Amino acid sequence: SNRSPSLRLRF
């Protein structure tokens, strides 16, 4: 449930 595009790769 992350809005960050970078963290979205993991989460």
UniProtKB/Swiss-Prot annotation:
The keyword Kinase does not apply. One of its GO terms (biological process) is neuropeptide signaling pathway. The modification Phenylalanine amide is found at F11. Both forms widely expressed in the nervous system. Expressed in corpora cardiaca, corpora allata, hypocerebral ganglion, frontal ganglion, frontal connectives, recurrent nerve, esophageal nerves, protocerebrum, pars intercerebralis, antennal lobe, tritocerebrum, circumesophageal connectives, subesophageal ganglion, thoracic ganglia and abdominal ganglia. Not detected in abdominal perisympathetic organs (at protein level). The keyword Secreted applies. Keywords: Amidation, Neuropeptide, Secreted. It is found in: Secreted. This is Short neuropeptide F.
